[in-house]
Design a protein with these regions (language model features):
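Structural motif
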Residues: 4-9
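Extracellular glycan-recognition regions
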Residues: 10, 17-247
Length: 247
């Protein structure tokens, strides 16, 4: 359920004053006979974006309301300010104070992404980044602040590193996600040194199997981590119902 709560059009009839959805089967089928209505074409969401427009397309979202300068479109690039954000759950007490105005909200994270639309897909991003010590940037499959899979570039002791990180509170569906006392954990699933400030990061998802690959400018490919289980990003484990983002 990494794509969250989806909406479907399904047949419905009334029986004894009660609505019955999908009568006869009680489940959604792949297709149903459509009524004879005029076509209403909808503009498809583009598969690629070279960021050469004046404004960001509506399919892209941020985490929180971005402030001026958090990102900009320039020279056919999306330039994002690196902004740290705590990778831990917000307690109900703190959330209540934020909503009442007693505490300021956390800064908008340095993130621009789009919703996961398919169970199997490939996401690719070309990135140029010159990290300082402990700074990171990359490509992430994000459910919330504390459940994610990401390939990131960072700097450690003066060396540029590419690594794949799994972050979570729990990977067990039977453990309630309302337990805010669970510590945030992260696992490094693969890493390697990288000699360039430019990398093409690729995430290939086949169902719940996620493979991250780093590609050099000349096309040379390096698998960073393969077939990582993304099941812990579903709502049963991570909570919520809005689905994952890629960005």
């Amino acid at each position: 359920k990494n794509m969250g709560r989806e909406t479907f059009i399904a047949p419905m009839v009334w029986e004894n004053g009660w609505p019955v959805v999908c009568p006869g089967t009680g489940k959604l089928d792949w297709a149903y006979p459509a009524p004879n209505l005029p076509e209403a074409p909808v503009e498809e969401i583009p598969e690629t974006d070279d960021f050469d427009e004046k404004e960001l397309a509506f399919c892209w979202n941020c985490l929180g309301t971005p402030a001026e300068g958090d990102f900009r479109l320039e020279d056919s690039c999306l330039k994002i300010r690196t902004t740290a954000r705590p990778m831990e759950p917000t307690s109900p007490e703190v959330m209540g104070k934020i909503r009442s105005g007693m505490l300021p909200n956390v800064n908008c994270a340095g993130f621009v992404g789009r919703r996961q639309q398919h169970m199997s897909y490939t996401a690719v991003a070309r990135m140029r980044f010159e990290p300082e010590e402990s700074q990171t940037a990359g490509l992430i499959l994000l459910q919330n602040n504390y459940h994610s899979l990401k390939a990131e570039m960072t700097c450690e002791k003066g060396k540029r590193i590419l690594r794949v990180v799994k972050g979570y509170l729990t990977q067990e569906a039977e453990v309630t996600y309302h337990n805010v006392d669970m510590p945030y954990q992260k696992e490094i699933c693969g890493e390697r040194e990288w000699n360039s400030d430019t990398v093409i990061l690729e995430l290939k998802a086949e169902g719940q199997k996620n493979t991250f690959t780093a590609v050099e400018e000349d096309g040379t490919r390096h698998v960073l981590a393969s077939e990582l289980d993304g099941g812990f990003l579903g709502s049963e484990t991570a909570g919520g119902f809005v689905g994952a983002y890629v960005g």
